[in-house]
Amino acid sequence: MSFSVTARRESPCGFKGAIPIGLRVSILASGSAGNLTLLETERTRILVDAGLGKRETLARLAAAGSDIGHLDAVLITHEHADHCNGLPQVLGIWKAPLYVTEPTMAQLQHNLPETFGKRLRGVESIQAGQRFAVGDIDVHAFAIPHDAADPIGFTFRTNGSKVAICTDLGYMPELVKFHLRATDCLILESNHDLDMLKVGPYPWVVKQRVLSRTGHLSNHAVSEFLADPEGFDSRARYLVLAHISQENNNPDLARLCAEEALGRRPAEFAFSGELLVASQHAPLKPLEL
């Protein structure tokens, strides 16, 4: 593998706009046209995926009220364009360490040779199952089933709070369900409606890919997970439906399916948090934990 591993950097304290809370999560964009999520504590700032260009990334950060003075890490879930198209620009702005698995990095070197074709400094090689720290945030990478080189999801823990980001997966293995338990903020894919996908504009081969066990979660699959107390433990303060297809789903339908599923839970396992839907076009309100 032709990239180097550097020592982890601590983040400076007290940056402009520091937040007197445990953790703030800003979902700046979510969908097939670009994904971008920022996690912040008073000390640390982590960007998960970089699917938007420089101008739009800066605009989304400003719209979410986030300081853009420094960034401590960029984490990439997998190499598909909607998760890394803006990565060269993001790294050019902030010079932040890049956390990525070796198979994903190999694909980035192939897909973006001008940026990643040479030996790089400031790259942290990670793997599924690994725990590591970025500033005062503990990160755990876990494997997800998707048609990419080495796709991963993440959980983040700090100051007694836990956040999980889990999108781009074809089904819900038990290990994934395990990682999503006891979260305060769960960001979960609800990509498509089965009927809309079947009659939609995608070619047959793409429909088969989306429906496969390495494709994307449907509203129905998410509903089955949310209705099952042995799957979703309902502890989350925020449940965010994410990566919603613009062609084969709509936010209202995804929300309706999730609400119906949550309504089927036994009373003793009722969900009392806030159900939200992330957007491709504008940042979701910052979620404070």
Predicted features and spans:
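Conserved beta-strand hairpin/beta-sheet module of binuclear metal-dependent hydrolase folds
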Residues: 3, 8, 13-64, 151-167, ...
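Active-site environment of divalent metal-dependent phosphoester hydrolases
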Residues: 33, 81-83, 106-107, 148-149, ...
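Active-site neighborhood of phospho(di)ester-bond hydrolases with catalytic His/Asp-centered motifs
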Residues: 48-51, 71-79, 99-102, 164-167, ...
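Active-site metal-binding motif and surrounding structural segment of the metallo-beta-lactamase
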Residues: 54-101
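Metal-dependent catalytic neighborhoods of phosphoester/phosphodiester hydrolases
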Residues: 85-94, 109-112, 249-256
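Metallo-beta-lactamase
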Residues: 102-153, 157-160
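Cap/insert and terminal regions of metallo-dependent hydrolase folds
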Residues: 174-277
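Short, basic/aromatic-enriched C-terminal tail that caps enzymatic domains
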Residues: 273-289
